Amino acid sequence: MSRTASYAGMTTPVKDKEGHGIPCLQPIDVVECTYQYFTKSQNKLSLRVGDLIYVLTKGSNGWWDGVLIRHSANNNNNSLILDRGWFPPSFTRSILNELHGVPEIGNELEIFQAGLNLKLELSSNPVILSLEDFLDCCRDIEFKEQLAWSPIPVHERKGCCELLYYNQDLDVYCRTLPYLPQNQVETVNDYSSFPAISKIAGKKMPITSSPDLFYLNDCDVVYWYDLTRLVCHYVNLTERDLLANEREKFLTSLDLLTAQITCVYMLFRNLRLVEDSFKKTLKKLIYTLSRFSINANIWFHSTPFEEREAIASQKDPERRSPLLQSILGTFQKFHFLLRLLHFLSNPNELTILPQLTPRFFKDSFNTISWNNPFLRKHLNQHMSHDLPRQMIKAVAGASGIVAENNDEIPASKQGTSCSSETSHHSPSAPFQRRRRGTIFSNVPGSSDESDTIWSKRKKPYPLNEETLSLVRARKEQLDAKLKQMIKSANEYLSNTANFSKMLNFEMNFKTYEEVSGTIPIIDILENLDLTIYLNLRELGDENRVFDEDVAIDDEDKEFLKHSLSSLSYILSDYFNMKQYFHDVVVKFIIVAQHLTLEDPFVFSPMQNDLPTGYYEPMKPSSLNLDNAKDKKNGSQNTDIQEEEDEYEPDPDSLILFHNLINQDSDFNDLKFFNLAHVFKKSCDDYFDVLKLSIEFVNRLILERENLLNYAARMMKNNITELLLRGEEGYGSYDGGETAEKSDTNAVYADSDTKDNDEWRDSQVKLPRYLQREYDSELIWGSNNRIKGGSKHALISYLTDNEKKDLFFNITFLITFRSIFTTTEFLSYLISQYNLDPPEDLCFEEYNEWVTKKLIPVKCRVVEIMTTFFKQYWFPGYDEPDLATLNLDYFAQVAIKENITGSVELLKEVNQKFKHGNMQEATAPMKTLDQQICQEHYWGTLYSTTESILAVDPVLFATQLTILEHEIYCEITIFDCLQKIWKNKYTKSYGASPGLNEFISFANKLTNFISYSIVKEADKSKRAKLLSHFIFIAEYCRKFNNFSSMTAIISALYSSSIYRLEKTWQAVIPQTRDLLQSLDKLMDPKKNFINYRSELKSLHSAPCVPFFGVYLSDLTFTDSGNPDYLVLEHGLKGVHDEKKYINFNKRSRLVDILQEIIYFKKTHYDFTKDRTVIECISNSLENIPHIEKQYQLSLIIEPKPRKKVVPNSNSNNKSQEKSRDDQTDEGKTSTKKDRFSKFQLHKTKKKAPKVSK
């Protein structure tokens, strides 16, 4: 803020003892605060009525600079506190030349009304300090924070430099460093400096109303200003009701005012403001309030209503009755004492007050009844019940213990009579083992008794059909018992006379048996695995905790945001259903217990007559006297609303009811009804909530499948991986279908695997110097494949001279980068080439070792190296350390030793490392069609409906298949590995150009089809387009082009297309059935079992597979299986410390890659139409995203006003389908009808009635 001023208050220097002029604080005016002004800004002053401000500068921008001097809150000394800052002059009045007091009080009521809106009395005798006294105060001030003085050099004309000291807070320059009082050094007697003693010597501190500690309401009192404003509001409201002659409202306002005065008294006690002046003022305040209450009641009882109304309506106070004037005078005195008490306390307006109203601690109350995983900050710590740190400190401080965490809290208390020095000597036990006697004994989640079912189950229930079957099976078992209980209730209603008391006890017993059978369902509802929805919320958060290496583009973010908004209400309804389940079961138990009571209404008088939240503070927006009356009436009318009685009245109870009326007894607004009818209704509700639980579990399962279905169809494997991260079972993924490949689909068949057992037996018969050294470190699987092993063992098996395992060799060379670095891998091969002979060999044994092992191993090493550089080399494998291996020298040595294949190895090494241009040498040759595309050969675009419908579906599907198969053939195994590994093993992989182009083409095709439909305004043309694309998808299926077929289906089931009900009605049913059959083929249930069966039956036919399944298999196999195996010994809990490579994981990856490569070998025998292909390619560019298409969809078919209730048993085929099934009005009404709370006794809740 600028300090431009018209008057400067610091120009006159003050000379010190040596005669040097020093700039100092010199006020130019003195003003008194007339209105309260509060601010949180550090450079502005917070003002109270009556404060004196010494003005230093009057700024031209409307803000003045001043100094405020107050006495310290510590009344034991006369120290001063100085505040300097900006303040608005409109809240003050100048008193420098007006040294006069406030006019004497003439009319008490008018002055009281003038001060209702927080206008405290001004000082009658303001004391203004002289300049000398003011400077003395400035020298002896006690600052809130220690002032920082910065040395600043100042150059004068003679060239010398002078050092000044500048304080930014005061904006003051000094020639010498001022002497300021420092805080006294804490002595050893201060027990708070010692952690061990402070726990027992610390004072009990009140728990403050911190928003970070509690779930506060908007109307909660946090600061002194809020409390003062609230109390004054009730004061004004009480007086207004008194003068308005409204007795019932007056008593209500007086009751609320008394409650607020009680809060004030509690605050003074909690803040330890117990000086004599405070005690006396508080006593006078309470006494005055009591006197006012008594006099007001006398006024209402002794004076008739009409007379009171006439007296209160008198505008002249002198014509009012003496009793009313006395009441108003007492009330004014009460208001004066309240302001006096506030002035004496002299608190800091920004100090947070102690918490008085009951509120839930944050992140702690969710473990009482139902578990809410969305409240956990650490999503993977399902079993963690640690309390929040702030809650621990607050509760411990309230008990006089200074604790930072759970372990510092004593395990038990020794008793109040123990001295502080011997109370706690032993270390505190862990918090989780503490049961009774601690300060957290009554805190939810602090003991084992309050733990939920979640903490007792090790694994959550997955969201699948198996879990749903468990719920259904349990419900069927409960239905049979429940029907019998309903039958008994009906018999009672039909024949009450023969219904014995013993039968009531029997029904009560069956109720408990029924409820105990509900525990498995509660267990499932409590422990459902909602990890995918938790991850969805975290993905939508800007500060997500996932790896930064995961790239999420704008389209993915749009999809995640859309999914989160459409699923949020389902999750909200699910948790409401759980609470509704709890309410129904509780009511079921209570009603069953009432059957055994002689008087079922015996506990009714214990019910509170006041509505819930009666004493809650009012919102700041409602603290306006003009509309407070209407708002209060509306609130009370809402609270006393009563639902219509659904229960059949009991004739005997009605007789009792009329007798009570005749006797003028208080019946507390009870509704008497037949308990058997209530029991039957409770059974029906219990039956319905069981059905409701199955419905919601089924909905969560379907929404999970829809979410993964969309991600899989759009080939967003990164989104799928993030959504499933941390889900139970995700870490132990079993490839299932992917591991079982037919012989015709297997590219590399190892015919020798059948003889592996015989070969391993033959190795044992060899001499020790010819046996492999690391055979004991190999782990074999049941399919005669290597499951794992150490690095040395795998290299030894790779270069074995007798056993050539072709599948192992290919798997190793493809996936070696997940085991070794390139330098490390080649170093192992060179070490294997230079094998050292075993010790203690004779001459004949050495010659045999060289002939039968060393030379063959050298040949295998050269062969493996040559194959690696020739067929499996990737530019991303290059590393700077490879130059240290001198591979060309190694190849030349092999040539000198006449090793087979060494010449070809030297040629490959020179080509890769000396001639450069590795990427150009190894990059696949581009096809002629791609070169033509780059020469900007543009065909006619399919930009209109007529141009699309003019193309024959067979021709369109044929050319689409040719184009997509060509793109599919450009996908390499390195593209697939790059897609799943990313930067996991190396940062030089880069992008996956072939695979990214294939995925981009499929997504563009989906957007093109959906956009072609929504941009058409005519409904009949849209219907023709739908049928046209369905026929194209059918022909794509006949051509085994599952990629294009899935892209078309995804477009037709997208949110912007599926919601067009009028357009779909114009499509003939046979065509819609055809679409359903295509969608059923790509159903993601059971890991695309229908599609996998269809794909497996193709054998040698050409095909363009749906790549989303491959991406899911690759992602799950890589992320769901560990890189290393841990072998367990015979002793429990003892593990082998040596790491064994999980080679089975690499084998599964290669199995999937084999199938991908297999479909690249068989080509289509179709004639290529270059014009159609170019039109298709060019039409897919510059298509709007899904959000723009959805807006167009709303334009051509707006949302209906009335909600269409969807079939709850229908299976939504994609995440976008259910987006429009619910409207806001529908959601609200459904929740209200489905989760309405029950009350056994329908009692009106309202304020106490007072007759006039």
Swiss-Prot record:
Q: Which gene encodes it?
A: SDC25
Q: Add the further remark from the entry.
A: Suppresses the CDC25-5 mutation in yeast (restores cAMP level) and has similar functions as CDC25.
Q: Where is the composition biased (Basic residues)?
A: 1239-1252
Which residue stretches does the UniProt record annotate as biased composition, category Low complexity? 416-428
One Pfam family linked to the record: RasGEF_N
Q: What does this protein do?
A: Promotes the exchange of Ras-bound GDP by GTP.
Task: Region Disordered: list its residue ranges.
Answer: 409-454, 623-648, 1201-1252
Q: Enumerate the spans annotated as N-terminal Ras-GEF domain.
A: 782-914
Q: Looking at the record's lineage, which domain of life comes first?
A: Eukaryota
Ras-GEF domain boundaries: 952-1199
Domain SH3: from-to ranges: 26-97
Give the GO cellular component terms, alphabetically: plasma membrane
UniProt-recorded name of the protein: Guanine nucleotide exchange factor SDC25
Extract the InterPro entries matched here: Ras-like_GEF, Ras-like_Gua-exchang_fac_N, Ras_G-nucl-exch_fac_CS, Ras_GEF_dom_sf, RASGEF_cat_dom, RASGEF_cat_dom_sf, SH3-like_dom_sf, SH3_domain
Q: Name one GO biological process term.
A: cell division
Q: Which organism is it from?
A: Saccharomyces cerevisiae (strain RM11-1a)
Q: Which PROSITE patterns match?
A: RASGEF, RASGEF_CAT, RASGEF_NTER, SH3
Task: Please note every region of biased composition (Basic and acidic residues).
Answer: 1214-1236
The record's SUPFAM superfamilies line, in alphabetical order, gives: Ras GEF (SSF48366), SH3-domain (SSF50044)
Keyword terms, alphabetized: Cell cycle, Cell division, Guanine-nucleotide releasing factor, SH3 domain
Q: What are the GO MF terms of this UniProt record?
A: guanyl-nucleotide exchange factor activity
Q: Which CDD domains match?
A: RasGEF, REM, SH3_Sdc25
Q: Which Gene3D superfamilies match?
A: Ras guanine-nucleotide exchange factors catalytic domain (1.10.840.10), SH3 Domains (2.30.30.40), Son of sevenless (SoS) protein Chain: S domain 1 (1.20.870.10)
